[in-house]
Amino acid sequence: MTVPDTRKGLMIVNMGPHHPSMHGVLRLIVTLEGEDVIDCEPILGYLHRGMEKIAENRTIIQYLPYVTRWDYLATMFTEAITVNAPEQLGNVQVPQRASYIRVIMLELSRIASHLLWLGPFMADIGAQTPFFYIFRERELLYDLFEASTGMRMMHNYFRIGGVAADLPHGWIDKCLDFCDYFLTRVAEYEKLITRNPIFLDRVEGVGIIGGEEAINWGLSGPMLRASGIPWDLRKVDHYECYNEFDWEVQWQKEGDSLARYLVRIGEMTESIKIIQQAIEGIPGGPYENLEVRRFDFDGATNSEWNDLEYGFISKKPSPNFELSKQELYMRVEAPKGELGIYMIGDNSVFPWRWKIRPPGFINLQILPQLVKRMKLADIMTILGSIDIIMGEVDR
């Protein structure tokens, strides 16, 4: 019997678009020499829904339900950037209580996003147990979201000038109980995962990105901070009321997959610190700005709060909130990095241009460089450490 010769040429393999490790409908065309990766070409666009064009034909409040479909694991951040941009453009003041509520919701959403990164990331490298652990804590988070917004996901909670509803009775106590409980769970994750020798073998020294390289690629979020750059927009831009709280930016120097894991684990603990301080210091007062005006056609200047010239932004399905003829770039520190909106108004209720800067799309661009000369199994580790959601990448 003749033995066939060993194939020595290159092999091209398709990973995705529905491979379980692809974190969505991402397709990778991988060129292999044995188990060594020679080239990797990401193919995007399978989840493109024209989100930027839709924004040009909707008022801001009409568009809010759409934005929760970008990063559907951290919807509070997409809502925040959608209302922050017109607030800045129209010089709308947000009540202090509403700002505190926003910070609490944003940090809870950050924890939820990092939890649903941690479980699949561990499953990618062969550890199934943490995948079930994170759903235990995530369920408690979603109970808090459901009690305050009415929805477990796709909350549609933020409004121009505030939030849709105040925190219900007893919610703050439940949130504090969750914070105390969750700190013990993070300690459990670190005990089970961080010092596990098998885990360290899979992630240490894999997918290294230097600090200058990260800046040149435009990386942000944990991808940037794990490369030795302590850059966090909550500290840099002082949006909402983050400057009133005592917390530290989490960062590492090594730039590998382990460093990105450590940054996200540390961020969950810091988020709990911010939430506890916000709950302790939350002021009274209104949860929305009821005095966001629209121009009165009669030209009256002395008006009462209940006159027709007042437009109650949160109370109408499609309020007449004009976007002045200006351009503006707004950004927030989302769990995956810098989420930005470049908006141009033209004295209309619809934005003339609505450009989205998704952190996942920018961070994904470095993937081909990271996986070259690595093993095939390392692709899952590196891709998982980047943390992408294809709804945000493809928009």
From Swiss-Prot:
It catalyses: a plastoquinone + NADH + (n+1) H(+)(in) = a plastoquinol + NAD(+) + n H(+)(out); a plastoquinone + NADPH + (n+1) H(+)(in) = a plastoquinol + NADP(+) + n H(+)(out). PROSITE patterns: COMPLEX1_49K (PS00535). It is an enzyme of class 7 (translocase). Keywords: Chloroplast, Membrane, NAD, NADP, Plastid, Plastoquinone, Quinone, Thylakoid, Translocase, Transport. One of its GO terms (cellular component) is chloroplast thylakoid membrane. It comes from the Eukaryota. It is a peripheral membrane protein. GO terms for biological process: photosynthesis, light reaction. It is found in: Plastid, Chloroplast thylakoid membrane. Its EC number is 7.1.1.-. GO terms for molecular function: NAD binding; oxidoreductase activity, acting on NAD(P)H, quinone or similar compound as acceptor; quinone binding. NCBIfam families: PRK06075.1, PRK07415.1. Belongs to the complex I 49 kDa subunit family. PANTHER family: NADH DEHYDROGENASE [UBIQUINONE] IRON-SULFUR PROTEIN 2, MITOCHONDRIAL, NADH-UBIQUINONE OXIDOREDUCTASE 49 KDA SUBUNIT. NDH shuttles electrons from NAD(P)H:plastoquinone, via FMN and iron-sulfur (Fe-S) centers, to quinones in the photosynthetic chain and possibly in a chloroplast respiratory chain. The immediate electron acceptor for the enzyme in this species is believed to be plastoquinone. Couples the redox reaction to proton translocation, and thus conserves the redox energy in a proton gradient. NDH is composed of at least 16 different subunits, 5 of which are encoded in the nucleus. This is NAD(P)H-quinone oxidoreductase subunit H, chloroplastic. The gene is ndhH.
